Amino acid sequence: MAEFISLYSGSSGNSSVVRCGERYLIVDMGKGVRTTGAALKALDLNISDCAGILVTHEHSDHVKGLSTFLKKNPLPVYGAAATLDFLDANGIVPVSCEMHSVSGGEEDIGDFGVTAFPTSHDVPCVGYCIHTPDGKTMTIATDLGVLTPPVHEALSGCDLVALESNYDLHMLRSGPYPYYLRSRIESTRGHLSNDECAAKLLELVQEGCKKFALCHLSQENNTPMLALQTVFNTFGAAGVIPEKDCVVQTQRRNEVSPVLEF
């Protein structure tokens, strides 16, 4: 059985694990080594069983903890070429670690097959479609302002989808953020709203996907209840019954979320 586990998720830091048997991959590391290490320890995950770290992009809420972690644990790092160039130029990845570009087709990383796909953000950014050794498929896509054709393709046919549900539009527009920041978040190079996420999840559940993780919720412009309720309202209007037809789970900001098997 494959598992998706969010170590922490939100605007202050993101990291998750995809595990199958003893082997696993880490996706991003946006908090310090103490926080990440404690999360891995709580899950009884040994560093020696990690096949590598997948990096989505260069923003600090996705790479803040990498440098210190990699000095102690020189794991291979995978990402888009532009992201790896940034990590290298800023000394984030020690010379003892291998770096591998994943801008082409499927890469064999340990026992996993990993395909990167571009997402629309204000720096070069990718999501990952991961095929597990037991034949399951999951896709993680965060930090995207719009669902482009490559994203639609990557999300289709998965057993589990982890998708950004960053903000509630009313909270964002009535909140304390200045206009330029609100505009950035709402733009096609910003983040995905609850409504946009819910509409896509409805398409996916109608195609047969049964497991969903709502990721990267904003602390200032969203709540877990709002994100879930938006999905449930969208599903309900189409006759889809959550918990009967599928599982939808928000990911916790500062602690490990419940395991999602797929």
Stretch-by-stretch model annotation:
Residues A81-G135:
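Metallo-beta-lactamase
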Residues K64-N73, D88-G91, N222-Q229:
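Metal-dependent catalytic neighborhoods of phosphoester/phosphodiester hydrolases
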Residues P149-Q249:
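Cap/insert and terminal regions of metallo-dependent hydrolase folds
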Residues V27-G30, C50-E58, Y78-A81, T139-T142, ...:
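Active-site neighborhood of phospho(di)ester-bond hydrolases with catalytic His/Asp-centered motifs
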Residues C246-F262:
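Short, basic/aromatic-enriched C-terminal tail that caps enzymatic domains
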Residues M1-L43, V126-D143, L160:
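Conserved beta-strand hairpin/beta-sheet module of binuclear metal-dependent hydrolase folds
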Residues V33-G79:
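Active-site metal-binding motif and surrounding structural segment of the metallo-beta-lactamase
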Residues H59-V63, L84-F86, P124, V146-P149, ...:
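Active-site environment of divalent metal-dependent phosphoester hydrolases
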